[in-house]
């Protein structure tokens, strides 16, 4: 199977082909400022199934988005709802890359909550390193929908740490006393200072 992603997504042009190396092709679709639309995703699926040869073509099995995107843009709750509807229509999981999730959740321009993401996405991950963790991300299957034998698959791909407790301890700490969000707020505050300085120099923003 394969995944649909914005042509700006890091999994499309970075990662040394890691996705393809695990036998999952990445298909890039057009984006606007890093975001893909439900309309574009629906059109891709419609065109795929309308092709008489689709049984012989690469099957689009999942939709991948980032929030915030690689451009720093944010999906609105409405946009996530629309993407979720299309994904369910075509029985394709919606996966959200949350490497920068903390920044997105505390942004003044954001209207999406963690509960919204859990409700609208089939899987997502909460990034740790961009809020100070030494390593790792927390993968979340919000509907008790983890693939069967998920841990076995993780281990088969060399991704199970011998000292895995190190990951858990970090996230336990990050989600105690709102530390995860406080760190993210500080990052946004610092970024706003930089943004203002760049704005005064005549730069424009998304």
Where are these regions (language model features)?
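Catalytic PLP-binding core of fold-type I/II PLP enzymes
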Residues: 75-107
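Active-site-proximal loop/turn and secondary-structure-junction residues that shape catalytic pockets
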Residues: 69, 100-102, 130
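Short beta->alpha connector loops at strand-helix junctions that form conserved
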Residues: 7, 28-32, 128, 161
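Active-site C-terminal subdomain of aminotransferase-like
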Residues: 59-66, 74, 112-206
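Single conserved hydrophobic/aromatic residue that forms the stacking wall/gate
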Residues: 2-9, 13
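Hydrophobic beta-strand scaffold residues
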Residues: 26-27, 94-96, 205
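Active-site-proximal loop->helix
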Residues: 14-24
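PLP-dependent aminotransferase-class I/II
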Residues: 23-61, 65-68, 75-82
């Amino acid at each position: 199977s394969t995944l649909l992603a914005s042509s700006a997504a890091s999994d499309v042009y970075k990662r040394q082909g890691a996705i393809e190396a695990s036998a999952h092709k990445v298909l890039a679709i057009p984006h606007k400022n890093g975001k893909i639309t439900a309309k574009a995703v629906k059109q891709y699926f419609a065109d795929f199934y309308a092709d008489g040869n689709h049984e012989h073509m690469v099957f689009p099995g999942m939709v991948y988005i980032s929030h915030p995107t690689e451009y720093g843009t944010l999906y609105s709750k409405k946009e996530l709802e629309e993407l979720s509807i299309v994904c369910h229509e075509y029985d394709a999981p919606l996966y959200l890359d949350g490497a920068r999730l903390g920044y997105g959740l505390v942004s003044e321009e954001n209207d999406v909550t963690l509960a919204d993401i859990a409700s609208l996405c089939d899987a997502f991950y909460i990034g740790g390193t961009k809020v100070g963790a030494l390593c790792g991300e927390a993968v979340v299957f919000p509907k008790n929908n983890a693939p069967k034998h998920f841990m076995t698959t993780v281990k088969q791909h060399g991704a199970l740490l011998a000292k895995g407790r190190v990951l858990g301890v970090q996230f336990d700490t990050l989600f105690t006393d709102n530390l995860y969000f406080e760190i993210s707020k500080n990052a946004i505050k610092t970024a706003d200072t930089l943004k203002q300085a760049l704005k005064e120099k005549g730069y424009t923003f998304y």
